[in-house]
Amino acid sequence: MGNNVPVRKLLIGIVATVLALVVGAVGTDFGAAIYAEYRLSRNVRNAAQLSWDPSVAILGFPFITQARSHHYKEIEIRAGAVDHAVVGKASLEATLHDIDLTHTSWLIRPDAPMRVGKLESRIIIDSTHVGRFMHIDDLLVEAPSRETNDSTGGTTESGISGSQGLVFTGTPKASGLDKRVSVSVDLSLTGPDQTTLVLTATGILTGPNTADQPVPDDKLAAVLKEFSTTITGQKLPFGIAPTSQGARGSDIIIEGIAQGVTVDLNGFRQS
């Protein structure tokens, strides 16, 4: 029995050594990923002339294997409250899949071209800034009351609703009303480069999940006009063409998805 003691000690030593090596390797990989994300965030900030570092994530494990192969599985970039000449503030998002780093380093220089297998690009305007633009200070934007889409509640993988029948609720003071009303609004894009967002009010909504406030017939046209507008300058990160527009939560989102594109960090912010 006593002869087993040295064997047990040897096994314990081997296991402890292996665990230490594994923990060290994971720690090294994690540290390298954090440094790469920090440098990428700083490079995006400088390239896009942002006021602060955007949120950046390089996804996939192990990181070092991806860096050595000059190929990242996925990168997420999110910049909130970016100055926008038309609406005041907007958020910019991009998700890059299958990124070829052949022409750049694992730290990704701002001007280095990256071949991206799939790129999802979004510009997001919250209810507050849409309302300020429309001069409806208490505006709340919501997805259509009836969605027949997937489990995310939207028609896209990122959970964006359809573009028809969004619910806009607010007080149309310019029309002479002092109570909140709910209006059905359709979204569309126009212009040669599809960067003008058109909001078209189509009718008053009453009943559950609305302000449930009718509008007098003599005020209807004015209210619908007040809830209709055009918002120019909606350029998506990396200049991707829009493919959908809708709501998520209380935000309006324009999204573009492209396959097989070459971009660099200088193109993240377009306006």
Predicted regions, residues:
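Extracytoplasmic/luminal low-complexity segments enriched in Pro/Gly and acidic/polar residues
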Residues: T200-S271
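Hydrophobic membrane-targeting and insertion signals
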Residues: M1-R68, H84-V86, N266-S271
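Hydrophobic membrane/lipid-contacting segments
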Residues: H97-T102, T156-D218, I252, I257-Q259
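N-terminal beta-strand/beta-hairpin edge segment
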Residues: S51-G131, H135-A174
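Short amphipathic alpha-helical segments
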Residues: A32-A36, R122, V215-K219, V223
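Short, solvent-exposed secondary-structure boundary motifs
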Residues: V130-G131, T171-R180, S228-G239
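Short secondary-structure junctions
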Residues: A47-P54, I136, Q234-G239
